[in-house]
């Protein structure tokens, strides 16, 4: 089915996640084994901490297929318990466990899998299912300060998490002594409210403006993080060798016609790239 979905480097039909986390068995299984409705699966959102603050964990949960990048002060077993207690769902999707990571024993499979799997990440967070958000890093307690909102590793400043905004997300990592200071709580609530409104009234230039202030490990990921938000059809593959300018060219050809019209009518200058009817990637960034 996945091979049939790919036509000329485009994903032409809806594709479910390749793998899901079976919470009862505590094992990663193929999606077809679970055969679960998308809205009955718990999505897990988190910002990746810096390399010096994380470690690679080999675990039987994913059959030791690849090392799972984790914050040094987090524990997969504790995350499993928290997720089990968060909702009644039996399956979850966590990128570090369900998306093949680097340096695994079948590394040669990762590039091909990512072409299809990375563009479909937004689908996991866009089908109205419940989600758990760890705002301070995967499995870490919710200890936020005002300085954290300016950190390049903050959930509110990562490129990938822009597509992971859920209206009624469950806040992960809460403990009894995690009461936020009043000013921090106000900032936290304001940021969430602003992002949720942005999702309710989508505008391509507003998404682009938001992405300007966000960080990504690879420049290309900023473009890839817009694919789901801009209702692309068909969906471009994730090509790690592609430049962000080329990826933007491809994206603007397949985004929803309303977003193309917005670029044409409302961007104040002609494009300085390959097309004059819409701005180049450098212009929007």
Feature locations, PLM:
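A general structural signal for short secondary-structure junctions and capping/turn motifs
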Residues: 32-36, 122-126, 151-154, 163-166, ...
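Generic structural signal for hydrophobic core residues of well-folded globular domains
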Residues: 47-48, 86, 165-169, 227-233
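Glycogenin-like
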Residues: 55, 124-187, 207-208
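Conserved aromatic-histidine-acidic binding/catalytic patches
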Residues: 67, 71, 106-109, 113, ...
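Short, well-structured alpha-helical interface segments that form or flank functional binding sites
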Residues: 116, 120, 157, 218-221
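Short helix/strand-capping turn motifs
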Residues: 193-285
């Amino acid at each position: 089915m996945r091979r049939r979905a790919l036509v000329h480097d485009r994903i032409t039909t809806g594709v479910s996640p390749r793998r899901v986390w079976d919470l009862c068995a505590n094992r990663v299984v193929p999606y077809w084994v679970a055969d679960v409705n998308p809205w009955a699966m718990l999505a897990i959102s988190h910002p990746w901490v810096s390399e010096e603050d994380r470690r690679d964990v080999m675990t039987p949960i994913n059959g030791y297929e690849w090392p799972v990048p984790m914050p040094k002060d987090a524990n997969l077993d504790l995350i499993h318990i928290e997720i089990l207690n968060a909702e009644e769902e039996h399956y979850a999707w966590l990128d570090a466990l369900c998306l093949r990571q680097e340096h695994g024993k079948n590394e040669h499979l990762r590039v091909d899998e990512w072409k299809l799997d990375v563009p479909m990440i937004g689908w996991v967070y866009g089908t109205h299912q419940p989600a758990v958000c760890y705002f301070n890093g995967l499995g870490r307690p919710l200890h936020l300060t005002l300085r954290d909102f300016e950190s390049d590793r903050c959930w509110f400043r990562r490129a990938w998490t822009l597509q992971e905004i859920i209206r009624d997300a469950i806040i992960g990592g809460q403990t009894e002594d995690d009461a936020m200071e009043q000013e921090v709580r106000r900032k936290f609530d304001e940021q969430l409210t602003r992002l949720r409104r942005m999702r309710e009234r989508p505008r391509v230039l507003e998404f682009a403006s938001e992405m300007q202030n966000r960080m990504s490990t690879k420049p290309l990921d900023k473009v890839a993080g817009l694919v789901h938000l801009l209702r692309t059809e068909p969906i471009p593959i994730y090509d790690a060798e592609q430049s962000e300018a080329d990826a933007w060219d491809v994206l603007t050809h397949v985004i929803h016609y309303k977003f193309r019209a917005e670029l044409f009518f409302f961007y104040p200058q002609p494009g300085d790239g390959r097309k004059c009817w819409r701005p180049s990637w450098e212009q929007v960034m």
